[in-house]
Amino acid sequence: MQDLKQRPVSVFREFLDSEAAGGIILMVAAALALIVANSPLAETYFSVLHAYLGPLSVSHWVNDGLMAVFFLLVGLEIKREMLDGQLSTWPRRVLPGIAAAGGMLVPALVYVFINRNNSAALSGWAIPTATDIAFALGVLSLLGSRVPASLKVFLTALAIIDDLGAVIIIAIFYTSGLSLAYLGAAFAVIAALVVLNRMRVMTLLPYLVLGAILWVLVLKSGVHATLAGVALALTIPLERSAGVGHDLDHSPLHRLEHGLHKIVPFFVIPIFGFANAGVSLAGLSLGALIEPLTLGVAAGLVVGKLVGVFGSSALAIRLGLADLPAHTGWSHMIGISLLCGIGFTMSLFIGLLAFASDVALQDAVKVGILAGSFVAAILGAAVLLMAPAAGVAEEETE
């Protein structure tokens, strides 16, 4: 019984360790992309991205194909945490849920306010709403034991809810030109996946085969293909197979999630970062940095996330709706709110969807994301370094 109670903690530790290491690799991949895009290899770099492999360009294979695997992992994490983890009860969901809501609403409002006179840019309102869990945990990992474990749990839970919000935003606001025939076929495949789940089929292969078919149908339907990964994830059983005991570690969901944790942080996300972070800085001036689109993204990530996450958390705590994470104080919450402004992967992805046909606007978005995420990471790390070490109580929390 003791082992069963401790299992979610060990799984969560594994998740944190994997994502932190992946975040560091992602930083290297993004930096390398910037270097290559501003070197004599730039022409080759962009030519490879626009080269076609079959029906899609390399860039599309990365953004529609590999990112579907990323969204599959996101969906698996959301399902597991909601049913058997850090978000399995309402008290556990309250603070990260409220913080995530504030952390999505306020950055969007900041972006819209700055771009209120720039109608062409308004479709990018969702870009600064995202938090990159890989990058954020990568920064936290560099701070070591100074960061309370409860703060890492809070950040991860917040980011999972944030990812769920991003999935909903993409499905509602960044889907167009629907093909009802392909969409109907996709729903038929989803129904078949649900039937497999209800029949307690515990072998992963039929789910993965139908998932591949679902990806093709969703791609053809006009809905963004990455959402096929989320739909597949929600049908993967969390129950254990008969005769394996009571440990949910043997469930199909956990087995697939465990396998993807070896692929996504160290392969999928770095490739996405390398393929999308490359932007030419030639001719970049201070004026370009304060263009409404770029400034809106950067300010949304830094100011919007700080005000949104910290403000909503503080309000919830003061109203008695939630408690501070264990062994943390307000300075920790300020630091973690700033780190939520690291919005690399999902922000880039939404930016590509928002301005799919305008490379100039995509580049402006990338500069804003890189600048905002860099500032948020530096400020957040600095605040957490100055905060009391883990386990030291702060008078301000009393």
Swiss-Prot record:
UniProt cross-references to Gene3D superfamilies, sorted A to Z: Na+/H+ antiporter like domain
Catalysis performed (reactions): Na(+)(in) + 2 H(+)(out) = Na(+)(out) + 2 H(+)(in)
Transmembrane among keywords: yes
Topology of this chain in the membrane: Multi-pass membrane protein
Main localization of the protein described in the UniProt heading: membrane
GO molecular function, one term: sodium:proton antiporter activity
Transmembrane segments: 21-41, 56-76, 94-114, 124-144, 153-173, 176-196, 201-221, 263-283, 284-304, 306-326, 333-353, 367-387
Keyword Transmembrane helix among record annotations: yes
Record's GO cellular component terms: plasma membrane
Any one biological process term the GO annotation gives: regulation of pH
InterPro entries from the UniProt entry: Na/H_antiporter_dom_sf, NhaA
Keywords: Antiport, Cell inner membrane, Cell membrane, Ion transport, Membrane, Sodium, Sodium transport, Transmembrane, Transmembrane helix, Transport
Disulfide bond sites: none
Compartment(s) where it occurs, according to its Swiss-Prot or TrEMBL record: Cell inner membrane
UniProt-listed HAMAP family: NhaA (MF_01844)
Function, as annotated: Na(+)/H(+) antiporter that extrudes sodium in exchange for external protons.
NCBIfam families, sorted: NhaA (TIGR00773), PRK09560.1 (NF007111), PRK09561.1 (NF007112)
Family classification: Belongs to the NhaA Na(+)/H(+) (TC 2.A.33) antiporter family.
PANTHER family, A to Z: NA(+)_H(+) ANTIPORTER NHAA, SODIUM ION/PROTON ANTIPORTER NHAA-RELATED
Protein name, UniProt field: Na(+)/H(+) antiporter NhaA
Gene designation: nhaA
